[in-house]
Regions:
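Residue in the alpha/beta-hydrolase core beta-strand immediately N-terminal to the catalytic nucleophile
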Residues: 91-92, 115-117
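Alpha/beta-hydrolase active-site loop
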Residues: 61-88
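Short glycine-enriched nucleophile-adjacent loop
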Residues: 100-111, 116
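Short, surface-exposed "cap/lid" segments of acyl-processing enzymes
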Residues: 3-59
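Gly/Ala-rich beta-loop-alpha elbow adjacent to hydrolase catalytic centers
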Residues: 91-103
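The feature captures the conserved acid-bearing segment of alpha/beta-hydrolase catalytic domains
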Residues: 13-16, 115, 125-195
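Catalytic histidine neighborhood in serine/cysteine hydrolases
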Residues: 189-215
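Catalytic active-site module of serine/aspartate enzymes centered on a nucleophile-bearing elbow/loop
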Residues: 208-246
């Protein structure tokens, strides 16, 4: 396994002979160090000969701006990899929680990708997402809602998101998931081929196995969560290798 390296604001894992590319955006503050938070998932994908680019960011209120920043960082990173490989890899975009929203708001509307995997799509208001915001924000005179807000986000997806191939994954015990809202918006588009998959787990399942392994070591691993991560790696890996639609 190659080592993580920093490129263009992203954490990158490049197998010796990459056969595909994963462009990953994590959720909320987990995405500050995705190479740690999502270690098990991302390294599992790299083991399938998929290059992994994970954008590192601190979440803010302007999600439209951050969607553009993430898209630009991942595009720049992809250019470095393609020059190195002397071939063009078309990515599968993978998002977790807020990361799904940022991918869906990308300036190219998903056109320059093979597919997208959306894990635990989350589209709550800022007040719902950030405890006490509604109480303290007025006194501080700060912005109290994400841009775009929840309803506008779904409208933009329905109107401007052009990628037909999407794998929307919901974890059964996830109290923050809004995948059904996403599926409804996607299904209203002409030619939509999105698929919905339910798995065991909760909102932190994509990240928790990596966190436990990184902080406590393999002895603290949770076999049930590891099995779910294995299923995620298989499903996303098949997308990345172009096997899902064969």
């Amino acid at each position: 396994m190659s080592r993580w390296q920093r490129q263009q604001g992203c954490w990158c894992l490049w197998p010796a002979s990459a056969q595909g590319l994963i462009e990953f955006i994590g959720g909320s503050y987990l995405a500050t160090n995705p190479q740690i938070s999502y270690r098990r998932l991302l390294e599992g994908l790299a083991a399938r000969q998929l290059a992994v680019h994970a954008w590192s960011y601190v979440p803010g209120f302007d999600h439209q701006l951050q969607a553009r920043e993430g898209w630009q960082a991942l595009r720049a990173c992809r250019s470095v990899l393609n020059q190195r490989l002397k071939k063009d890899l078309v990515p599968v975009r993978v998002g977790h929680s807020l990361g799904c929203k940022l991918h869906l708001l990308a300036p190219d509307g998903g056109r320059n990708s093979l597919a997208m995997a959306a894990l635990s799509f989350n589209n709550f208001t800022a007040e719902r997402s950030i405890p006490l915001l509604g109480t303290i924000a007025p006194s501080l005179g700060v912005v109290t809602e994400f841009s775009p807000g929840p309803e506008e986000t779904l409208r933009l997806i329905e109107r401007y998101y052009l990628q037909p191939h999407n794998l929307v994954i919901r974890f059964g015990a996830d109290q923050l998931d809004q995948s059904q809202d996403l599926m409804q918006a996607l299904s209203k588009r002409s030619g939509d081929q999105s698929q919905f998959v339910a798995m065991n787990g909760d909102h932190l399942t994509p990240a928790s196995a990596g966190l436990r392994q990184g902080l406590l070591g393999d002895w603290a691993d949770d076999p049930a969560r590891a099995r779910v991560i294995g299923s995620l790696i298989e499903s996303i890996g098949n997308l990345g290798l172009g096997l899902e639609r064969q």
